[in-house]
Design a protein with these regions (language model features):
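Alpha/beta-hydrolase fold catalytic core
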Residues: 1-22, 41-45, 70-71, 75-78, ...
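Short beta-strand/loop motif that positions the catalytic acidic residue
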Residues: 223, 229-231
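Catalytic active-site module of serine/aspartate enzymes centered on a nucleophile-bearing elbow/loop
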Residues: 251-285
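Conserved alpha/beta-hydrolase catalytic His-Asp/Glu region
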Residues: 149-221
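Active-site loop/oxyanion-hole signature of alpha/beta-hydrolase fold enzymes
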Residues: 6, 34, 47-92, 102-103, ...
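Conserved HGGG/HGGXW glycine-rich cap/lid loop of the alpha/beta-hydrolase fold
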Residues: 12-58, 267
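Flexible "cap/lid" loop of the alpha/beta hydrolase fold
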Residues: 111-149
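Acidic catalytic loop of the alpha/beta-hydrolase fold
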Residues: 209-210, 234-238
């Protein structure tokens, strides 16, 4: 644990050389990187962080908004003992990493965005199940009770299975041991009274970006670090149309589309994902 305005959990997967910091998405934790993290250690020292209000990182002096977590990522790089890092962020973690890259540019050497939170596609908006899970809780007075009712009716194992079904194109490709770790993390999360309010606050902070395309466009145009954008063609949470829009906004970025893969390539197709990342890291060294 690091002490950065409160306890912050960092998982160190090992490796030597420049720092590669992995940043999870909404409702996730460092366990989201347990498959891909060790595979990346040939490219540097690989660590993953539990963002504020997620995993085992208790909210303290700071809250769980994407802005606060953008600052946290910069502070974690410093606390681990590096001047800068390559950030690899998935979903909300991609947005957090973009904010770090803009607000603390000297701390970000390179940026890898993995199915990051992006403006909602008008042609292919999220389906009903996704809207219910991500937008429904934002309705005043609904969020906390809805979470409690859901968890009362679903075991940690059932919640993990349902989540993986939603965020992958084929959940069977997620290793059983990784599924077990995600379930254990889910079980621990249920014991934290701050977990649901943190999820809701973070979700609201994401909405302030993804529902405002012009604001998002201004953000990505301020990023100066070399950037790789990786996106699954079958992502139900963030349409591949949104990724193509981002790639058009920044033609200088490298864009890789993973055919037949969902929202979490690092879990669903880890070896393919790592090959894409390591090849790009070598090409941009």
């Amino acid at each position: 644990m690091l002490d950065i305005g409160g306890p912050i959990r960092v998982t160190d997967y090992g490796g030597q050389g420049p720092l590669i910091l992995l940043v999870h998405g909404l409702g996730g934790s460092t366990e989201n990187w347990d498959v891909a993290g060790p595979l990346l250690t040939g490219s540097g020292r690989v660590c993953a962080v539990d963002l504020i209000g997620f995993g085992e990182s208790t909210p303290g002096e700071r809250g769980p908004s994407v802005e606060e977590n953008g600052l946290l990522v910069a502070d974690v790089i410093d606390a681990i003992g590096y001047d800068n890092a390559t950030l690899i962020g998935n979903s909300m973690g991609g947005l957090v990493s973009m904010i770090t890259a803009v607000e603390h540019a000297s701390r970000v050497d390179r940026l890898v965005l993995v199915d990051p939170a992006l403006p909602v596609s008008r042609r292919h908006p999220p389906d009903f199940e996704v809207l219910t899970k991500l937008i429904g809780p934002l309705v005043p007075g609904i969020g906390v009770p809805a979470f409690r009712v859901y968890r009362a009716a679903h075991s940690p194992e059932e919640e993990t299975a349902e989540t993986l079904r939603m965020v992958t194109a084929n959940s069977e490709t997620v290793p059983e041991w990784a599924r077990d770790r995600l379930t254990d993390a889910n079980r621990r999360r249920r014991r934290h009274g701050w977990a649901i309010p943190s999820f809701l606050e973070a979700d609201r902070s994401i909405a302030r970006y993804v529902l405002r395309p012009r604001r998002f466009s201004r953000l990505i145009h301020k990023i100066s670090a070399p950037t790789l954008l990786v996106h699954g063609s079958e992502d139900r949470l963030v349409s591949v149309d949104s990724a193509r829009w981002a790639a058009e906004q920044r033609p200088d970025w490298t864009y890789e589309e993973m055919e037949g893969v969902g929202h979490v390539p690092m879990l669903e197709a880890a070896e393919w994902f790592v090959d894409l990342v390591t090849d790009w890291l070598e090409a941009t060294t």
